[in-house]
Design a protein with these regions (language model features):
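Phosphate-group recognition and catalysis centered on beta-loop-alpha active-site segments
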Residues: 1-252
């Protein structure tokens, strides 16, 4: 699967309806979006904890300290291109309700387990109305407690633990090591892993160990064809990219 990172964010402003809708037009199998909780309990699509980047440095508000109405008054598109001046921060509801039939939606939770109440409020009526959403949405997070909470609440919905790697300058080893990572996967109850596309860490043995545990395997953020082919050949379940059309065309 080709997943559009924050929507088609290589072209359109990240985490906006403009980016998500463009991703569908470009043939993405799914989109990934980042979500924070506002002061008044709404779940909104934004990567950072503040609005500085998406406002082009003009407005610096902490999302968790601000109400939805104020957040949605901010132009979050012009920093990318003036033609997107009307872009606003969407809610989780807006993104879910625009999800085409059969497409995937990876919901990256950027805050902690305090999101579970509002998340339940958004999802329950939609899951009751459209049961197939269970197979369309996935939760992803770097916080294993969030993944664990999602798995306990919705055991039939995929929830993947996210991991990136840092090289220890003294030893030259990448951290976390595989043993530590797999321990975290186990305690998170994750159904899969979304991992940084690090060729020095992710090899066939790594993938085989995941498969033995029946875990899905996803990589981010891949924008070049050579790397995409490498991970496709390793059997990756999805590739997350800023340029879904480029990667799809390159893998044909």
């Amino acid at each position: 699967m080709i997943i559009a990172h924050r929507g088609a964010s290589g072209v359109a402003p990240e985490n906006t309806m403009e980016a998500f809708n463009l991703a569908w037009k470009l043939g993405a199998d799914g989109v990934e979006g980042d979500f924070h909780l506002t002061h008044d309990g709404h779940i909104v699509a934004i990567h950072d904890a503040n609005t500085s980047k998406v406002s082009g440095g003009k407005v610096n508000l902490l999302v968790k300290k601000v109400k939805l109405q104020e957040l949605q008054s901010i132009d979050v598109g012009s920093w990318k291109d003036e033609k997107y001046a009307s872009a606003r921060i969407p809610t989780l509801e807006q993104v879910i309700d625009s999800l085409p039939k059969g497409r995937r939606f990876f919901i990256e939770i950027k805050c902690g387990t305090e999101i579970m109440g509002p998340l339940t409020k958004v999802l329950m009526p939609r899951l009751e109305k459209i049961p197939e959403l269970t197979n369309q949405i996935s939760f992803i997070a770097f916080d294993y407690q969030v993944i664990k909470a999602c798995r306990k609440k919705w055991p039939n919905i995929e929830a993947n633990f996210l991991e990136s790697y840092e090289k220890n300058k003294a030893t030259g080893k990448w951290l976390p090591d595989k043993n530590e990572l797999f321990k975290t996967l186990k305690k998170s109850l994750a159904s899969g892993i979304g991992t940084q596309a690090n060729k020095e860490v992710i090899d066939l043995d790594f993938v085989n160990d995941l498969r033995e545990l029946r875990l899905t395997f996803h990589c981010w953020t891949i924008n070049d064809i050579e790397t995409a082919r490498h991970f496709r050949d390793l059997g990756v379940d999805s590739i997350t990219t800023d340029f879904p059309k480029r990667i799809r065309d390159g893998l044909k």
